[in-house]
């Protein structure tokens, strides 16, 4: 009797363990979470592809991408939803791809690319370049950061 009960319990445990080893179906869409401190731009939205400006260059993320963590640099994040493309300029941040085809982007700032004026960017860049040679080290450091961001924005607007 004891052997029969033990055998049944062992069979149930083995059966549960066997069920857990089946692979899940691959995701057919990339789920995008794009968050800023004051706003969420995308929350679990199914997208086709996202192109990111990262420290090592530009990368494109599709569904089933290998899990990664990347540092974003100033540049354009392009979100492709079907035939529509949305472009956002980010000053930096982080992107994380999860094994379940979820891409999470966090950034301090992100603005639609079409909300910028090329003339204003040129004027701000000229002012930042003047401040880069300032005697005050804090002003010079802030100006160098502004130059990096504004040059990336100017290149994106071309």
From Swiss-Prot:
Subcellular location per the Swiss-Prot or TrEMBL entry: Mitochondrion; Mitochondrion inner membrane
Segment annotated as transit peptide: 1-22
Gene Ontology biological process terms from the UniProt entry: proton motive force-driven ATP synthesis
Keywords, comma-separated and alphabetical: ATP synthesis, CF(1), Hydrogen ion transport, Ion transport, Membrane, Mitochondrion, Mitochondrion inner membrane, Transit peptide, Transport
Pfam families in UniProt: ATP-synt_DE_N, ATPD_C_fung
GO cellular component, one term: mitochondrial inner membrane
Source organism, top-level taxon: Eukaryota
Molecular function via GO: ATP hydrolysis activity; proton-transporting ATP synthase activity, rotational mechanism
Principal cellular location given in the protein's record: mitochondrion
InterPro entries on file: ATP_synth_F1_dsu/esu (IPR001469), ATP_synth_F1_dsu/esu_N (IPR020546), ATPD_C_fung (IPR048938), ATPsynth_dsu/esu_N (IPR036771)
Disulfide bridges in this chain: none
Annotated SUPFAM superfamilies: Epsilon subunit of F1F0-ATP synthase N-terminal domain (SSF51344)
Stored HAMAP family: ATP_synth_epsil_bac
Protein family per UniProt: Belongs to the ATPase epsilon chain family.
Free-text function comment from the UniProt entry: Mitochondrial membrane ATP synthase (F(1)F(0) ATP synthase or Complex V) produces ATP from ADP in the presence of a proton gradient across the membrane which is generated by electron transport complexes of the respiratory chain. F-type ATPases consist of two structural domains, F(1) - containing the extramembraneous catalytic core, and F(0) - containing the membrane proton channel, linked together by a central stalk and a peripheral stalk. During catalysis, ATP turnover in the catalytic domain of F(1) is coupled via a rotary mechanism of the central stalk subunits to proton translocation.
PANTHER family the UniProt entry points to: ATP SYNTHASE DELTA/EPSILON CHAIN, ATP SYNTHASE SUBUNIT DELTA, MITOCHONDRIAL
Complexes and interactors: F-type ATPases have 2 components, CF(1) - the catalytic core - and CF(0) - the membrane proton channel. CF(1) has five subunits: alpha(3), beta(3), gamma(1), delta(1), epsilon(1). CF(0) has three main subunits: a, b and c.
Protein name: ATP synthase subunit delta, mitochondrial
């Amino acid at each position: 009797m004891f052997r029969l009960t033990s055998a049944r319990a062992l069979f149930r445990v083995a059966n549960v363990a066997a069920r857990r080893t089946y692979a899940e179906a691959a995701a057919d869409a990339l789920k995008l979470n794009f968050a800023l401190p004051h706003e969420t731009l995308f929350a679990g939205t199914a997208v086709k592809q996202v192109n990111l400006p990262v420290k090592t260059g530009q990368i494109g993320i599709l569904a089933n991408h290998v899990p990664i963590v990347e540092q974003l640099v100033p540049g354009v994040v392009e979100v492709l939803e079907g035939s529509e493309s949305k472009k956002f300029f980010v000053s930096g941040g982080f992107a994380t791809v999860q094994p379940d085809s979820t891409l999470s982007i966090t950034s301090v700032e992100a603005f639609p690319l079409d909300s910028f004026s090329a003339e204003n960017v040129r004027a701000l860049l000229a002012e930042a370049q003047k401040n880069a040679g300032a005697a005050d080290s804090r002003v010079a450091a802030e100006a160098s950061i502004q130059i990096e961001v504004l040059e990336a924005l100017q290149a994106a607007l071309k």
